[in-house]
Amino acid sequence: MGKKYVYLFTEGNGTMRELLGGKGANLAEMTNLGLPVPQGFTISTEACTQYYEDGKVINPEIQAEIMEYIAKMENITGKKFGDLENPLLVSVRSGARASMPGMMDTILNLGLNEQVVDVIAKKSNNPRWAWDCYRRFIQMYSDVVMEVGKKYFEELIDKMKEEKGVTLDVELGADDLKELALQFKAEYKAKIGANFPDDPKEQLMGAIKAVFRSWDNPRANVYRRDNDIPYSWGTAVNVQSMAFGNMGDDCGTGVAFTRDPATGNKGLFGEFLTNAQGEDVVAGVRTPMHISEMEQKFPEAYKKFVDVCDILEKHYRDMQDMEFTVEHGQLFMLQTRNGKRTAQAALKIACDLVDEGMRTEQEAVLMIDPRNLDTLLHPQFDAKAIKSATPIGKGLGASPGAACGKIVFTAEDAEAWKARGEKVILVRLETSPEDITGMKASQGILTVRGGMTSHAAVVARGMGSCCVSGCSAIIMDEANKKFSLGGKEFREGDYISIDGSTGNIYDGIIPTVDATIAGEFGRVMAWADKYRRLKVRTNADTPTDARKARELGAEGIGLCRTEHMFFEADRIAAFREMICSDTVEEREEALEKILPLQQGDFEKLYEAMEGDPVTIRFLDPPLHEFVPTEEADIKKLADSKGKTVEEIKAIIESLHEFNPMMGHRGCRLAVTYPEIAKMQTKAVIRAALNTLKAHPDWKIEPEIMIPLIGDIKELKFVKKVVVDTADAEIKAAGSNMKYEVGTMIEIPRAALTANQIASEAEFFCFGTNDLTQMTYGFSRDDSGKFLEAYYEAKIFENDPFAKLDQTGVGLLMEMAIEKGKKVRPSLHCGICGEHGGDPTSVEFCDKIGLDYVSCSPFRVPIARLAAAQAAIKDGRN
């Protein structure tokens, strides 16, 4: 016997999600529970995969098996497909393993043609219902299978209602609906160039194909990418005998949740509509009634429904989202699934289910999607306002939250406008470190270029600001302070609203609501901390960021980028003097001005972290990022150095590099200018000694991290400068304070020679942004230009800068840990790239034995929860 592709509901169960999809598995499970489910069958996800393997056709064997199961349905129902005495009508629905918005809409009443309509009209003595079913079927099939837009049919309905002087669809009579059905068929022929199919088998195969096709539509692909759903899963198709909610006033249809999906409060929440079918409830054609009103209309069916809700919630031990139909007072269940919910509701439901004895703490931790916690920590758009808003463009949702403000085009303007009380959105082609003060002053940041790990994205996430990056549809005119998007021109001072979670951009003002964290958040986080192994640190460069991260549960700083400190107004001038100096003495003199300021920065960080570990990365970016670009600043620098403007411009020109990300940066700066490493070491050690003196009970052990090491000899050279300087400072202070010198692993060669590097490094920290960039040979700032094409061609399913590439980059990490720990068993390893806040990447870090992950402050709760889930899934508690 060949492979089985089709299963009756009675042949499946709730554990078969991979094969039957979520909807099919749940229909089978409800059947097994003895609930009133219209019977049918599920075509498996493997049939979908086969459809694509066969070149997007349903092969004859699978078609034959489907028709064999139609015959089985005929036996169960006593009706026949396409029959002119007792015809069988079916619905066709998609159903992937995970709930997938954007997949194909439902098709109802399949199996109808004009002859069958006449039969059911006579048989039921209800011609209005019969023609209503047919016109709905033509509309759904045309829209969903043949992609003839709904609007053409809606226009015909509106015209008919106008002619008849009525306002609701239900007020149209049988003759009106018959006329509409004929108009719909004519519209179909005009658009498609062929007659509407009358053969039920042709209709069925067309609908099944449409479900398979929808697995690969652009909406589904984007949703899959955002939610880690592999393309290889495929979707199942459910074919179910019809239950009719549109046969009269003793019929109806509804959607309900066993708890409120917005708040998590226990109690039935949903809507119901009499004499209606399928999508009518959610389509908003008529105003539905609250589910509680169903009790007056259909007391028997309502009582049964309340019992079913109770059975299903207890069975699945989770909040259920259900669809049902009432036909002549009799209840039929069409679907159940774990309901989608807000982050706030997810926390409340998880806690309540533990209190009700339905779930253990570990199970409750596993119920919550870590990524959804983002929405708890940032402002969001008002739910009603956003529902009626239409985006004018879309970029990448690079840093969550919602923001609304007046457009400005420079960091200086952002600061100036904020100073006078304006709320602004900073719009840039791309951002650079010198834009930081302007980014801080803005409600949100919008960039034309750059990906999920671009400068704008990383900095915005660190600050907890909203950011949409890489909106390449924007046509920028910086000189005239304007841009165009979505066919409209926007000037400085115009209002726009941006959503950093979805990447959507809106014209005008959309009101926002502040984030609220309820008591359940703390409770779930306490459970997460109880079960996780991985430590969670933060990437923070300022005391404000550090304090925020600590508040959100960070256990130390895994990355302090010292370069951001150089951009402050009181020190950039001195640093520029250092860059333009001719001798070591001149450079040391300029650095001496920065030393007390940098020391002060570090003292504040140590104070904020109260004895938790602090890892400080020495200067990383190339020097050209620090030099002035404005004429006035160049003149100022020339005057301070006693040089001509031309000489300064020549120095600036000499710093230009063809490939700066692989150029004169990281440890290479410390090799060329050891005095920079010396000054930074003094600042770190003096700050630590002062903090220790003020708080002798704190554990202050500085961790100094050398970036971009590719060769053991580089590390030896820089480490000697650090150790000689640090030891002298500690000795002079009469202290015995300990410190560590470690390295970033961000060049593939460092991972490959990790055994050598571990002989000098006391800790490894994986800088996965650069490691990904160098392993793939992609520039992270330019990859957005071609990644879309890679997604379409199915080369990539995810952005490797947002989700760690476990097979390539991950292999290098595993290798480095193994080699390093062989040489130095006490070696502690962490990750401080943006991947540290991505749940699937955190799970991988747990699996390969990292000691900690470090991420931006607002991602700390996400990492804590993801780390707990990784440990629980691994069965370590």
Question: Which residue stretches match the model-derived regions?
Answer:
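Structural motif
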Residues: 238, 408, 425-427, 446, ...
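Conserved alpha/beta-domain cores
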Residues: 93, 517, 527-877
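Glycine-rich phosphate/ribose-binding loops and adjacent secondary-structure elements
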Residues: 329-332, 429-440, 444-446, 452-458, ...
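Nucleotide/phosphate-binding sheet-loop regions of phosphoryl- and nucleotidyl-transfer enzymes
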Residues: 1-389, 422-425, 432-437, 443, ...
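Protease-associated
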Residues: 358-442, 504-510, 521, 525-529, ...
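Short beta->alpha connector loops at strand-helix junctions that form conserved
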Residues: 41, 448-450, 469-472, 560, ...
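C-terminal domain-closing interface element
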Residues: 334-336, 491-539, 545
